[in-house]
Regions:
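Generic protein-terminus/edge-of-domain signal
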Residues: 1-67, 71, 77-78, 112, ...
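A hydrophobic/aromatic-rich effector-binding and dimerization subdomain
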Residues: 2-23, 76-144
């Protein structure tokens, strides 16, 4: 299996529907060709929570090693990929959603004041969450529910 993309590496998979723009999936790196998924991007936000194993995760040129209990926020339009480490499998939950799921209506106060500043900040292409940091562990608990 591999991610279907267009010529610009935009993922072609629908992440939910217009009525409910959210997709939650149970993923396993060994299901992908060579234990990795290709560089791709999408206009949705993606949250990844590692259930077991480790994943080498890259976002816009930054590399991370995520292990059991870690998570990552991958911003809209960020180019990202992932691969097995030392041939060991990784199981994770991927939650992908359209930003409008957070703000509802275009040009709402929530969109303009809170969501858009995060989506357009080039320094926030990704944020790693570790269970060792209290506030991040609270975020991870929500991601794992």
């Amino acid at each position: 299996m591999q991610i279907r993309m267009d010529k610009e590496n935009r993922e072609l998979k629908a992440h939910g529907s217009y009525e409910f723009p959210v997709n939650i999936s149970y993923e396993q790196l060994s299901r992908y060709e060579r234990g990795s998924f290709s560089w791709h991007w999408h206009p949705e936000i993606e949250l990844t929570f590692v259930l077991s194993g480790q994943i080498g995760y890259q976002v816009n040129g930054k590399s991370y090693v995520l292990k059991d209990g870690d998570g990552i926020f991958c911003n809209t339009n960020a180019l990202h990929s992932g691969h097995m480490i030392d041939g060991m499998d990784c199981v994770y939950i991927s939650t992908t959603f359209a930003p409008r799921f957070l703000y509802g209506f275009s040009n709402s106060m929530i969109q303009t004041r809170y969501v858009e500043p995060v989506l357009t900040d080039m320094q926030l292409a990704s944020i790693v969450f570790s269970p060792e940091i209290d506030w991040q562990n609270q975020v991870l608990a929500c991601m794992h529910r």
